[in-house]
Amino acid sequence: MPAPIRLRELIRTIRTARTQAEEREMIQKECAAIRSSFREEDNTYRCRNVAKLLYMHMLGYPAHFGQLECLKLIASQKFTDKRIGYLGAMLLLDERQDVHLLMTNCIKNDLNHSTQFVQGLALCTLGCMGSSEMCRDLAGEVEKLLKTSNSYLRKKAALCAVHVIRKVPELMEMFLPATKNLLNEKNHGVLHTSVVLLTEMCERSPDMPAHFRKLVPQLVRILKNLIMSGYSPEHDVSGISDPFLQVRILRLLRILGRNDDDSSEAMNDILAQVATNTETSKNVGNAILYETVLTIMDIKSESGLRVLAINILGRFLLNNDKNIRYVALTSLLKTVRTDHNTVQRHRSTIVDCLKDLDVSIKRRAMELSFALVNGNNIRGMMKELLYFLDSCEPEFKADCASGIFLAAEKYAPSKRWHIDTIMRVLTTAGSYVRDDAVPNLIQLITNSVEMHAYTVQRLYKAILGDYSQQPLVQVAAWCIGEYGDLLVSGQCEEEGPIQVTEDEVLDILESVLISNMSTSVTRGYALTAIMKLSTRFTCTVNRIKKVVSIYGSSIDVELQQRAVEYNALFKKYDHMRSALLERMPVMEKVTTNGPTEIVQTNGETEPAPLETKPPPSGPQPTSQANDLLDLLGGNDITPVIPTAPTSKPSSAGGELLDLLGDINLTGAPAAAPAPASVPQISQPPFLLDGLSSQPLFNDIAAGIPSITAYSKNGLKIEFTFERSNTNPSVTVITIQASNSTELDMTDFVFQAAVPKTFQLQLLSPSSSIVPAFNTGTITQVIKVLNPQKQQLRMRIKLTYNHKGSAMQDLAEVNNFPPQSWQ
């Protein structure tokens, strides 16, 4: 058989292909030749053929038939064969294929090889694609190489240990003795990988930071040497000594200094040194400064150091690089809760970012601008945000309008300003506002008795000839119907009165009724307004009767029903019409956002920043709730009854029975979800059904200590308790989930199960995202009925996405305080 062509010749041949079909033909022809060579067990050219196969794999063509040949090359004694074999294994194999387990013995032999380069190949492969089974079998060899004096092997072994810990976290303690001397190494590669290993251990186990805090002085010394060292061509990047190692050390210091006064004190000086001495003309220096800022803000640093960190972020906002401006805005958004006054100093720069062409920067600047709004700057900030609302892209208008509504409601200096601001939003972006904007504005106007004449006149002017903003038209129609007499009489004192006749008012409402832009809801507002004017106007009652009778035959069922009922009011109940259509009374405000939260910042009290994101609409991700019944093995379990219908019906049977086996399920199936417009009338009685729309308790049994139910991998779940003196069998547990890691935890779902003697109701969570750096929490309420006063116990299930991986964990909570159930 002729010798196969070399890899270089194959690459040159493939590059000459003019079409994709011609390239496929060349690849198929070469693959056929490689298969023939594999069948003949040709050891001479196996290495060359596998190398060509890997190139084809990189081009996107199938190369799975070369997997076993890679294993044969790994078993070879030639280094060149091993190198290609291990490379092929890393590209063609993964832990989902059983073939990779055949490599375990070869990797073990190579880890004990006398040549460091062979050992390095084995470490690289294990650290790249080793499964949990392989990691368990080979962790001992990795630990031995971690203690060797060879720096080439130590750095590779440290990275391999990181992979082992990720796959098998319970093997973490095996590597603890080997980590003691890692930071004494002079080699930067070993130092870098050692810091990566220590960081991974601290992130995986909540007990590790306390164990490694004794290394803080050593880490500080290493970082100081890097800053003070002279020019080193081996490690210099743009005039900075080994910035990669500096960034890694800063991240580890951030973890070790979190919630620890002594460690934070030990690193304050070096952080100040890094922040003041790092060159910012190059992107490398900006990366180090960014990590320094994150570390300063996350540990218990001095107030002066925090001001320095925020000033660095302020300088970042002036940088020409859009990426740097974006991370500065994101970081300021995280720190504004704790250092509100310091961030306020950079308000003008932040507002300027609203004019940036980059949409990501604009969105972050908008969110941060709303977070900076308070009672002192509300007028100036609203002026800028209204200008932004007028000129921004459509995808920003909904969030911006919602933020303006919340800010105006919270900090409005006067009712007139409040009404003018909301009307300006409705005029500018009426089609993008939330559904509750119309009733909220109507409620505000109703409660502002002294502003009725002013408001109806402004609204009348606003909709003259323009019905494009339907929410604005709806509010205007409602106000004209309620206060049309004030409009006609010209009683407005705030601005010059206008001369409007009754017929002109009816003309504009009839125009709304016949406009092609008017929705069915808007027409309903207009028809009701016309009907209400029959008790406020004196000269146009006959015209109103005629308009109402015309719509008695409308093809719109809702409009027709209204018109027929109004006609009946004229004909049969005319004596009651004035009483039925009298002016609406002052409405009581129903607060849905909870009380204003006050935070302490630098000795001054500031309102907590506004959340610009609307509350989550639609069903929460609770489809996995059925799996939770698997938690209490061997016990009868009461399934959780959700308080709101989910997107798909679930029951206590079906897939649950697959999970539970012989566990007896006694809970009734959950009812199928009802349509949103139809209330659920029949629902099985359940504990605390009558409390869902009322405050939970008026008399709370105080003095129940809170507990930490779960703390692992940066996620912490705390339980606080409330009990009613009038119904002591009911315990209300409020869970708070916080996240101390560097990335948000998304799609978070908390589930719980209790034994059959209890009843449990799990209310909807406040969000599905647990913010990073402990910048926010998810709250969720659990109601437990314990009529027999038995000791409370619970199993919980947590599912969420973190760092691109789906996480799931089960835990049992048995440490409930006696006051919560006795």
Swiss-Prot record:
Instruction: Report quaternary structure and partners.
Output: Adaptor protein complex 1 (AP-1) is a heterotetramer composed of two large adaptins (gamma-type subunit AP1G1 and beta-type subunit AP1B1), a medium adaptin (mu-type subunit AP1M1 or AP1M2) and a small adaptin (sigma-type subunit AP1S1 or AP1S2 or AP1S3). Interacts (via GAE domain) with RABEP1. Interacts with EPS15. Interacts with SYNRG/gamma-synergin. Interacts (via GAE domain) with AP1AR (via coiled-coil domain). Interacts with CLN3 (via dileucine motif); this interaction facilitates lysosomal targeting.
Identify the stretch annotated as signal peptide in this record: none
Q: Which residues form the GAE domain?
A: 702-817
Q: Which SMART domains match?
A: Alpha_adaptinC2
Q: Where is this region: Disordered?
A: 597-628
Q: Does the keyword Membrane apply?
A: yes
Keyword rRNA processing in record: no
Enumerate the InterPro entries for this protein.
Adaptor_Complx_Large_Subunit (IPR050840), AP1_complex_gsu (IPR017107), ARM-like (IPR011989), ARM-type_fold (IPR016024), Clathrin/coatomer_adapt-like_N (IPR002553), Clathrin_a/b/g-adaptin_app_Ig (IPR008152), Clathrin_app_Ig-like_sf (IPR013041), GAE_dom (IPR008153)
Q: Please describe what this protein does.
A: Subunit of clathrin-associated adaptor protein complex 1 that plays a role in protein sorting in the late-Golgi/trans-Golgi network (TGN) and/or endosomes. The AP complexes mediate both the recruitment of clathrin to membranes and the recognition of sorting signals within the cytosolic tails of transmembrane cargo molecules.
Q: Which family does it belong to?
A: Belongs to the adaptor complexes large subunit family.
Bilayer topology term: Peripheral membrane protein
Q: Which GO terms describe its cellular component?
A: AP-1 adaptor complex; clathrin-coated pit; perinuclear region of cytoplasm
Q: Where in the cell is it found?
A: Golgi apparatus; Cytoplasmic vesicle, Clathrin-coated vesicle membrane; Cytoplasm; Cytoplasm, Perinuclear region
Keywords for the protein's UniProt record, in alphabetical order: Coated pit, Cytoplasm, Cytoplasmic vesicle, Golgi apparatus, Membrane, Protein transport, Transport
Where does the UniProt entry say this protein principally localizes? Golgi
Task: State which gene encodes it.
Answer: AP1G1
Q: What is the protein named?
A: AP-1 complex subunit gamma-1
Q: Name one GO biological process term.
A: vesicle-mediated transport
